[in-house]
Amino acid sequence: MAEIFESVDKNKDGKILWDEFAEAIRVFSPQITSEEIDKMFIVLDVDGDGQIDDVEFASCLMVNGGGEKDTEEEVVMKEAFDLYDMDGDGKISASEIHVVLKRLGEKHTMEDCVVMVQTVDKDSDGFVNFEEFKIMMNSNKESH
């Protein structure tokens, strides 16, 4: 999670400004509108100061354990899942993770990505489904 934050925080000031956020989102969704980016940014900018700090970034990508459906956090997590699920089949492969991390400037090997999948792949199908993705994001948060 920290690596993703740092890759979006281009000027390395510890805050993600709207322009930095928009640039990162457009890498994956070139046709997204500014209005859609605004909605996502507002969800992440919890304190409303016009910038996203690392705590806001991490906390908003985590789903609260209360089981509420369609919370804003759940929606943001689903949008993040959809970015990784490049072929739209409802599951994420190690190669999809590798491509996304590479686009974000991360230096993970394919083997690293296979291990990421294996770590959370509870049903042993070789892919990460949405529930497993949430576990993966939570474990990333705890390890940073």
From Swiss-Prot:
Q: Which residues bind Ca(2+) 3?
A: 121, 123, 125, 132
CDD domains for the chain: EFh
Tell me yes or no: is Metal-binding among this UniProt entry's keywords. Answer: yes
UniProt cross-references to Gene3D superfamilies, sorted A to Z: EF-hand
Keywords attached to this Swiss-Prot or TrEMBL record, sorted alphabetically, are: Calcium, Metal-binding, Repeat
Can you name one GO molecular function term for this protein? calcium ion binding
One Pfam family recorded for the sequence: EF-hand_7
What does it do?
Potential calcium sensor.
Recorded protein name is Probable calcium-binding protein CML31
Which organism's genome codes for this protein?
Answer: Arabidopsis thaliana (Mouse-ear cress)
Which gene name belongs to this protein? CML31
